[in-house]
């Protein structure tokens, strides 16, 4: 799996899991699957929407929200660059990612090669090792 929904909190936060979000302000980016998922995963949380990740991240840093949720691949960048926040280890969903290819002649073979390469990297745990090395996940 390439991505899953996770939580980013301030380093001194007492939030350790999605169960701790009741009554807390949780930031999401409008129109994302994270917004939709949070409504069912944490119905007692106060969901606060933002136009983009940078604004939501700033709100977390400024204490306007208690947690920020999105794909772990997005949130990991903030945690990697800023030790005043931390990414909680649990993933609450599996988020599919896609690769866009041009329609037409030759695309079928390219798609097969890409699919093979990704599956091979998953089978050999290359993706897991890269995530741990570079994203600290």
Please give the residue ranges for each predicted region.
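Soluble non-cytosolic domains of exported or imported proteins
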Residues: 28-32, 51-54, 62, 69, ...
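Alpha-helical elements of the RecA-like P-loop NTPase motor core of helicases
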Residues: 19, 35-36, 57-58, 76-77, ...
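Ligand-binding clefts/hinges and TM-proximal coupling segments of bilobed small-molecule sensing domains
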Residues: 33-50, 83-91, 118-137
């Amino acid at each position: 799996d390439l991505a899953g929904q996770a939580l980013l909190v301030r380093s001194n936060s007492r939030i350790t899991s999605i169960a701790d979000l009741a009554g807390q302000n949780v930031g999401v980016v409008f129109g994302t699957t994270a917004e939709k998922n949070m409504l069912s995963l944490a119905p007692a949380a106060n969901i606060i929407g933002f136009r983009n990740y940078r604004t939501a991240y700033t709100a977390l840093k400024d204490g306007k929200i208690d947690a920020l949720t999105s794909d772990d691949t997005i949130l990991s960048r903030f945690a990697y660059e800023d030790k005043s926040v931390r990414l909680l280890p649990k993933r609450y969903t599996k988020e599919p990612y896609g690769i866009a290819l041009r329609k037409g002649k030759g695309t079928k073979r390219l798609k097969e090669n890409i699919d093979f390469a990704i599956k091979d990297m998953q089978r050999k745990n290359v993706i897991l090792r890269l995530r741990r090395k570079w994203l600290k996940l």
